[in-house]
Amino acid sequence: MKTPRSVVASITSQLSQAGLISLLTLSSLGALYAAPLPSSFGVWDRGEAMDPKIYPYLRGTTCDSPWNEVEKADGVYDWSILDKSLERAQRENLSLYLSFEAGPKTPNWVYTKGVPKVLTEGGKKADSFPFYPYYLSPVYKTYYHRFLFAMANHIKSYPKEVQQRISFIQVKTGCTGDECPYKGDAVDEKYSLTTKGAEWRAFRLETFALYNKLFGKASGLNISLLLSNVEPETEDGKADFVEEWKWATANLQDGFGIKNGALSRGHHLSGERSSMTMFLPYLVDAKGLTLFRRSEMDQTWTRPLYQLNVPLNFYWGAINALNSGQSVWDVTKSAVEQSKAQGFDYSFYFFNKYAGQIYPATATHAFCALHKGLDAADVVAYPEAEFGKAAHGNLERMEKIRAVYGKYGAANDDKKALKLGQVGQRGDQAGFNDVGWNIWPDNYSRLLYQIAPDETSIPLWRVGGPITPTSPIYSRFARGFEAASAKNALYFRLHEGFSADASPKVMTLTVVWYDGVAGSTWKLDYDIGAPTMKTALTVTGSGDKKWHHEVVTVKDAVFRHGGTKGSDFALINTDHKDDVFSLVEVNRGGQELPALRPPTDVRPVGGFAKGTKYNSDKSKKGGK
């Protein structure tokens, strides 16, 4: 059944009067957005109504109000999903982000109006949904736009204090949040649309402009948007979503959100380096355009690699995400529920502590997690003439790189996984690899950096021996002294602006170190604005083979890079024995109590120990 032209014309007239037709022509207006407050950055649940009294690290939640649930009948709206979510957010003092999924969640009645029903075949998830709308159908766009217009009006009906619970809206133009038109390929070629194609791009940009008009500053709601598949040209010349990036940066000039699911789901994942470097200047101490970043933890944590040591993997996943400037970490229900029993809720508190530390002048905390990733894609660090051709599948090159650092603990436990992309690694990798392809090569940090790490210290992996299910979280990566090669100091420098002037300040420093040698000694020196650094702490080891937290508060810290090598403070070897360090933290003021510490007793919980590979999971769905 086709919709009469008079009906389409009537609806189109209504939308046109509201200024919602041909919105791309309005892009020159450049709507401005108020980005979510950094105080809302941290761990969120994925809309599963987890109780923040039981899980106090939760700072927010999500609400998807899919079109087929809201408008089950033509023009009849059921707002109960959204109403209940906002009521809960207000009651429990949570932030909330929204999405309004359409695409395969288009109401069935829309197809009776003349919208073509698209069937798909092929692809990994072609059976995810039975059918899809043809997005370019004028009838589809007419009713879809009407739905979004009604959604905006309903949000405007809430009191201001309720509206302010909404941190951002994730724009979903196609399937779920993946931003593809279909899972698989259209059976009928005349309905074919591809994720990187011009027709799909035009539809997305039109939808972006619609959201901009309906929910942005000009609408009075002033809600930020989060966009997927939006990025500048990459270092290797890829320009798949550059037009989307250009539109967003021209029209959402006060900032917007981006999605990157992988960075909080693990470490040493293929492609993570490019993903970090591309956006980090817009996320931490941004100059001009400011972005925020959302990522999620799905069922990756139940897969083999994570299950080798769950607390350790969650910790380094959190560290990896913070290093990339991540703002919001959506965590699946199963992980939230198991977090305390399995001892990895520490990682959520740690993430919360640092997620909002994005402006050095106002930041209260900074950290540097000591690490070296052996990136086989780096031909400067590992020349092809010495290590072989730089190709993702060149395992011989990867093994040659690893061999250089084998004496420091570097190993590749699952060589097959070295060839995989990050999705395959998250699902099927069954061992820790210290070499990778396009992985992060340096320390992980937020506003605190080590100076010349390889010149003054050595990298270390698997401190204390092979990683087991009960190994301490810090044992995965570290750096240390090597007296035999005259590497006897680790120098650190805070981000410019963290210490604004030369006046004395109260600062607390925390050093996590491994006590591996009885009688070993080291000290912490810091910048007081004098020609020589001052000693704040001296430590003597007992050799107990355990990780320790040393905490010292100083009241005369200047931290204006006046120490040795332009440092603010340094860890100095005071004998010929070698000490090992994993984490260094700085916070303004005195020590915070109770101190945030990881559990000392890690016990694997029955039923979660082995993990399930993607290729042995018939559904192949991560789920929630």
Model-derived features: positions:
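N-terminal substrate-binding region of glycoside hydrolase catalytic domains
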Residues: 35-135, 298-301, 326-336, 348, ...
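An active-site-proximal structural segment forming one wall of the substrate-binding cleft
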Residues: 90, 128-168, 203, 207-210
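Substrate-binding cleft of secreted/luminal carbohydrate-active enzymes
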Residues: 101, 254-433
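Substrate-binding cleft/loops of secretory-pathway carbohydrate-active enzymes
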Residues: 170, 177-181, 196, 205-208, ...
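Glycan-recognition and processing domains
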Residues: 388-497
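Short, surface-exposed beta-strand/strand-loop-strand elements in extracellular ectodomains
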Residues: 519-531
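Extracellular carbohydrate recognition and processing domains
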Residues: 531-563
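Short beta-strand-plus-loop segments that form exposed binding edges in beta-rich domains
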Residues: 570-577
